[in-house]
Amino acid sequence: DIDEIREENTEDEFRNLYMCEFVREGESAFSLNSLIGCGVDGYDDWPDWKPFAPRPVGNRPVWIGYDANGSSGNGDSGAVSVVVPPSVPGGRFRTVETRRVQGLEFEEQAKVIEEFTFRYNVEHIGIDVTGGNGEAVYQIVKRFFPMAIPYTFTLSSKRTLVLKMMQLMRSGRWEYDRGERELVTAFNAVRRVKTPGGFITYETDRARGVSHGDLAWATMLAVINEPIGGENDGQQFTVMEF
């Protein structure tokens, strides 16, 4: 079924593999117009969001993603992203807060995550353990949040993260406050790369002088708690790695 094939591949992979179209390596994985279109005025559009309050979204559940220093590409520096998941199946995700942790020791990075658990009703923490400080941060975080999930980045898993995020953007299911301008830069820094074997994967491009791709990967590690295909039944990940 052609629709199933499209769901299982990014638009560029579909064009490259099934339509015999050439896809240029190094292009941004996410359309700038789509990214800008996901931005909203949080103060007007999110009545439950009080960013300077002790509990910015009250008791609403949130999912947190953490991207470790340097592990998801060549230009990352580590970041945490806080996302409010939809309250109903198929609803919208909202990135309500982000923080970059560049220059912090792994104990301090884990402390940043712990501080978020004091301010938010955290249901999920996805942690990149591929490299950098990730494994050490995970070992600390699981002491105060035993349900934290470690994710190992591979060619396939990064593709899954990007596919999920593209799906959310296409369906209008992801929003961020326009004040979070670095998020646009972060997602625009995620580039498609073709391996020697012809497999398309994704990395952050440091050669272009961008070091904020970490915010994008952290956001994707939060939203992937709703796996591809799980948007209609509220299904969430229960596996420890992917």
Could you tell me what each predicted segment is?
Residues 1-155, 159, 163, 173-242:
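RNase H-like, metal-dependent nuclease domains and their acidic two-metal-ion catalytic environment used
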